[in-house]
């Protein structure tokens, strides 16, 4: 049975002899490929692991590709920050849906997905050795980007319901702190932060001279809770960096289109970073994104209504485990972050669930949860009937394993 993966302590000799840099070795091993390897070795596994949706792009986005490629300009490098017509369309979307007027001190930059937007932000605002505060549980790619940039992740525990602990966030600030990160709706917990909490974080960042980085990739995936964009708060433009992705809302995961709003003062820095790493977002993906945005939010909303029903089923099945697990109510995204009452290592439990019960989840340590045993399950990637079968396997597997090890 595999042990929990950990960073390798690099040495000078290792780097000098052709090994990876100390900076890269310090980054946590990506968890998705680890779990994917176990799944490949166990045919027939139902994956409640990776955070993707079960649907693809709107047919209008695919149909739009027929009109792409006929002009020589379609095959040239485009603007670093994205095609002007897509940037303009996003500015309208942000104004109409998020209440964010980018004309008041912000700029829009199109990126190759939300992860690039986050790395752009970190590289633009932080120097090696600087600190960035991540509420725990955190999205593992955020931690990976911070460490890759030579900075330090400062994990701060959330409350038992995975809501922000504002006092703890304030107490974690040091002279090296550059930003506080929030993700709402949250990956991995599914928590939706209320306006009061996000406003408090935004005000704290402004008062202490920090940036507020806010990830809104799951903005449409809420269940009876409003979504809030801190960038729309009065006075927020100068210190707020927000980011979005088309991967979830429009089924665009492989097309790699995201976007970010940044203070005007950071525009040149972000463009320099993106020009170095990407040159420009792929024109064909931007072309399809324009068509998807014309279809708009109703496309995603129809799928969210189905997910709401699946969510109800997931919680009802998990309830049959009684006090073996705790599943805090998640009002957003398509995740449940289970606390499992066991002394088993989370990676060991996750691997056993795959090999013995053919159902995959993601171990909690990938999200910064270093005490206890937690598993994240995703119910967004599969058809409702398949999710039901996967949850039944998970419930049966947890019941069998936990009762045998009690």
Where are these regions (language model features)?
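Conserved glycine-rich beta-strand-loop-beta hairpin in the small C-terminal domain of fold type I
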Residues: 290, 306-315, 327-339, 371
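Helix C-cap/helix->beta junction micro-motif
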Residues: 42, 149, 207-208, 357
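A short helix->loop->beta-strand "cap" motif at the edges of active sites that frequently abuts
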Residues: 151, 207-210, 236-238
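Conserved core of the PLP fold type I
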Residues: 74-203, 220-234, 392, 402-405
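N-terminal small-domain helix-loop-helix segment of the aminotransferase-like
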Residues: 6-15, 21-112, 120, 292-295, ...
């Amino acid at each position: 049975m595999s042990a929990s993966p950990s960073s390798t302590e690099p040495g000078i000799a290792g780097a000098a002899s052709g090994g990876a840099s100390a900076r890269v070795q310090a980054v946590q091993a990506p968890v998705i490929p680890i779990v994917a390897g176990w799944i490949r070795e166990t045919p027939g596994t139902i994956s409640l692991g990776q955070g993707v949706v079960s649907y693809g792009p709107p047919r209008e986005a695919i149909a739009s590709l027929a009109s792409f490629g006929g002009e020589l300009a379609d095959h040239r490098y485009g603007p670093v920050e994205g095609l002007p017509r897509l940037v303009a369309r996003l500015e309208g979307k942000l104004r109409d849906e998020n209440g964010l007027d980018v004309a008041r001190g912000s700029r829009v930059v199109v990126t190759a997905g939300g992860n690039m937007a986050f790395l752009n932000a970190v590289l633009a605002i932080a120097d090696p050795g600087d600190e960035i505060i991540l509420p725990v549980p955190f999205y593992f790619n955020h931690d990976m980007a911070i460490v890759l940039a030579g900075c330090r992740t400062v994990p701060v525990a959330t409350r038992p319901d995975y809501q922000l602990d504002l006092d703890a966030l304030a107490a974690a600030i040091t002279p090296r702190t550059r930003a506080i990160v929030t993700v709402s709706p949250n990956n991995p917990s599914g928590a939706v932060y209320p306006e009061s909490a996000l406003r408090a974080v935004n005000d704290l960042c402004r008062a202490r001279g920090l940036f507020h980085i806010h990830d809104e990739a799951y903005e449409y995936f809420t269940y009876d809770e409003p979504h809030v964009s801190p960038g729309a708060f009065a006075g927020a433009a100068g210190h707020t960096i927000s980011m979005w992705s088309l991967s979830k809302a429009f089924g665009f995961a492989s097309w790699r289109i995201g976007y970010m709003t940044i203070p005007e003062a950071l525009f040149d820095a972000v463009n320099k970073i993106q020009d170095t790493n990407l040159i420009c977002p792929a024109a064909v993906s931007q072309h399809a994104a324009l068509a998807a945005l014309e279809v708009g939010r109703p496309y995603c909303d129809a799928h969210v209504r189905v997910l709401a029903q699946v969510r109800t089923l997931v919680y009802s099945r998990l309830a049959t485990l009684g006090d073996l697990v705790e599943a805090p109510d998640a009002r957003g995204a398509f995740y449940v972050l289970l606390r499992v009452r066991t002394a088993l290592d989370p990676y060991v439990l996750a691997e056993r669930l795959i090999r013995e019960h053919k159902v995959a989840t993601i171990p909690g340590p990938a999200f910064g949860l270093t005490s206890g045993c937690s598993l994240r399950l995703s119910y967004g990637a599969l058809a409702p009937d398949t999710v039901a079968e996967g949850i039944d396997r998970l419930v049966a597997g947890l019941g069998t394993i936990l009762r045998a090890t009690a």
